[in-house]
Amino acid sequence: MNTLLIIDGLNLVRRIHAAQPDENDINNVQQMTLLACTKMLKTHQPSHVIVVWDGDEESWRKKLYSDYKKGRKPMPEALKIALVGIRNTLSEAGIHSLEAESEADDVIATLATKMVENSGAAIIVSTDKGFSQLVKKNIQIWDHFKQLFLDISAHEKKLAVEQYQFLDFIALAGDSGNKIPGIAGIGPKSAADLLNKFRTLANIYNSLDNLGAKQAQKLAEGREMARISYKLGQLQCHMPLEINLKQFRVKK
């Protein structure tokens, strides 16, 4: 079975950079990134590897909701300039890159989905818990910094909902890390309680008459924001990609 190792480029590099004693020591970031990717290849032994990078275009999520990811700390200018060199270093080692038009997330989700649809497997390297919605047979999430696969059961326990409810949970409670709003006045505990009782967002909205007046009002008034939040959190798994996987085969 072919296995594609998909590395979330900026997620990896920015965390490596943040851990450096001297943030201007870009050469060390470059070498640490290469070492990290080499270690992943040794650990997972994939047939193919690809590093996906965010592009410069405004994402469709930002167009849908202007506050999406608002307030994120911008990438240090020195690191931004060094990305080309980092990509070249990886390419020289046989680890090739793909740049998304905007966010890398949907491209990563599409690559993983296509691998499974073609009887392969995918390992996504990222600390972004948004990829948890993709976990199933032959799709795993690897945290390079903890050296662990995402334990979906532990993640379910943390949120107090099941995996199939993750997007409904975001629709209700939002996602503070990405500035996805959710419904005003509905926090993580209330969202989990509602989903444990009614199972789905649709069932919740079909049962407003069975809820307390204040909570029902919050849900009714926040219905459109719930719809937007769900869409913001949902990864697009069938983006049009014009690539040939052969160019990303690991050279033995």
Swiss-Prot record:
Domain of life, per UniProt, equals: Bacteria
Q: Where is this region: Interaction with DNA?
A: 185-190
InterPro entries tied to this protein: 5-3_exonucl_a-hlix_arch_N (IPR020046), 5-3_exonuclease (IPR002421), 5-3_exonuclease_C_sf (IPR036279), DNA_polI_H3TH (IPR020045), FEN (IPR038969), HhH2 (IPR008918), PIN-like_dom_sf (IPR029060), Xni (IPR022895)
- Residues in 5'-3' exonuclease domain copies: 162-251
At which positions is Mg(2+) bound? D105
| Swiss-Prot/TrEMBL keywords | DNA-binding, Endonuclease, Hydrolase, Magnesium, Metal-binding, Nuclease, Potassium
EC class: hydrolase
Q: What is the E.C. number?
A: 3.1.-.-
Q: Which cofactors is this protein said to need?
A: Mg(2+); K(+)
Molecular function, one GO term:
magnesium ion binding
- Report residues binding K(+): L172, A173, P181, I183, I186
Single biological process term from Gene Ontology:
DNA replication, Okazaki fragment processing
Q: How is the cofactor bound?
A: Binds 2 Mg(2+) per subunit. Only one magnesium ion has a direct interaction with the protein, the other interactions are indirect. Binds 1 K(+) per subunit. The potassium ion strongly increases the affinity for DNA.
NCBIfam families in the cross-refs: PRK09482.1
- Report the function annotation for this chain: Has flap endonuclease activity. During DNA replication, flap endonucleases cleave the 5'-overhanging flap structure that is generated by displacement synthesis when DNA polymerase encounters the 5'-end of a downstream Okazaki fragment.
What family does this belong to? Belongs to the Xni family.
Recorded protein name is Flap endonuclease Xni
Report the source organism.
Shewanella denitrificans (strain OS217 / ATCC BAA-1090 / DSM 15013)
